[in-house]
Amino acid sequence: MSTRFTERGVPLVESQSLQLIQSASRLNDVITKYLSQRLVEKSYTSITPSLLSFLSILECGVNYGSEIARNLGVTRQMVAKTVKELCRLGYLEQINSAGKQKEIHFTETGEYLMSDARQLLSEVDEILFKNLDRKPKQIISELNMIAYAVNEKQHT
């Protein structure tokens, strides 16, 4: 393990974990930006990388703002604002249900948007995995094992 130093001489230990996190983040940013650009070309209006990332965590059926907020680690107000924008754009709709909560559903346009995004991702698969020795499932499994190990360490 090597160590670099800041201008003031503070040691900075090299970290493969940091490199992994930065590479994964960069890959996520590049793919999400590519998808949003391609979807805009397909006439899906105003679909930004951040809105696309938000949509990607939703279930195909019923969603609730509180569950979305919990999964994303954000406030319900932030979720409500984003859902309102996606409803305005025609990708989501809110339906009154029992109690205060509203059900959040994809509209037909929203379902087509997600279908087209998945199709574009399958095309990205060709680029990502064509020159690799290992199978995508193996890489995904290894990344999940890393995430599990870090999560376990957090709770011990």
Which positions does each model-derived feature cover?
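N-terminal leader segment of winged-helix/HTH proteins
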Residues: 1-45
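N-terminal helix-turn-helix DNA-binding core of bacterial DNA-binding proteins
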Residues: 33-78
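Charged, amphipathic alpha-helical coiled-coil/dimerization segments
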Residues: 5-7, 84-141
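C-terminal regulatory/oligomerization modules of transcriptional regulators
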Residues: 1-12, 135-156
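Alpha-helical linker/hinge and terminal dimerization helices associated
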Residues: 20, 24-27, 31-38, 72, ...
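N-terminal positioning helix adjacent to the helix-turn-helix/winged-helix DNA-binding module
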Residues: 16, 47-51, 109, 135
